[in-house]
Amino acid sequence: MENPLAAAVGSRRAPLSRSLMGLLAGLLCSTAYAGPFQVYGSEFAWVNNFNNSTINSSFSTNSVPGMTVWYNFASFSLYGYPAIVRGWHYGWNPANDTLFPKQLSATSSIPCTFSYSSGGSNMAGDFAYDMFLRWDNARSTPQLEVMVWAGNDSWPIGSQTGTNVLTTGGFTFDLWEGNNSAAGYYVYTFIPHGTAGQGNLPTGGGLNVDMKTFFNWLQAHRSNAGHYSNSMYLDVVEAGLEVTRGNGWAFVTANINAH
């Protein structure tokens, strides 16, 4: 059966909206895990391709988790999210690491490092951290998603509700938020100020941050909305590239911890 969302996205002439990407992700990710992976101790590199999209890969051979991916997608859609992962993605964790789930009220810091580079033509997407949370420690389907974007030329889900809300890691962030109805959870996205929908995917960069900074902000400014509380459990932290178009390559490497 033809995917009507994919058909609609394929006909677009502007960058794919995050709302459509969210719908696609909600329909496609669930419990089916496509794409190769490589375990690096407590973390793993995973070519999370959606709908069996062709994303080729080569994993780093040293002890630092990293990978290069290359692909050729002419039209806009959400083809995958190759990423470095620590924790339980929808209850799946081939590294069997036990750092997560971790209750945020009992967590003092979540130090993360993330570096990336890319090259090619018509490249589009977003280099981003992706985090899933639950109200319990069941290692199961997410009940909240929090994203922190770095270099991008895309659009977050929902609408912008905050400008210059915090500064860390060399960026000042805006906040976007909205409901991913297809996936069944709410999404908060912190994105570098003024970068939503910019014309070009950056060819290199990085984002080294303490993720607890973002959760502290949500506790102070969004806990009354009912979507987030520091009593929630963090299931997973991922750092990678949401691939939405291009003929080229990307490299990602990351290290994720929590105390």
Predicted regions and their residues:
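N-terminal segment immediately downstream of the Sec signal-peptide cleavage site
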Residues: 34-82
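Bacterial N-terminal signal peptides
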Residues: 18-30
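Long, compositionally biased interface segments
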Residues: 197-259
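Short helix-loop boundary/capping segments
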Residues: 137-213
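Surface-exposed extracytoplasmic segments
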Residues: 55, 60-61, 65-76, 91, ...
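N-terminal secretory signal peptides that target proteins for export/translocation
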Residues: 1-15
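N-linked glycosylation sites
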Residues: 51-52, 56, 96, 152, ...
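Extracellular-facing segments of soluble proteins and assemblies that are Gly/Ser/Thr-biased and enriched
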Residues: 86-167
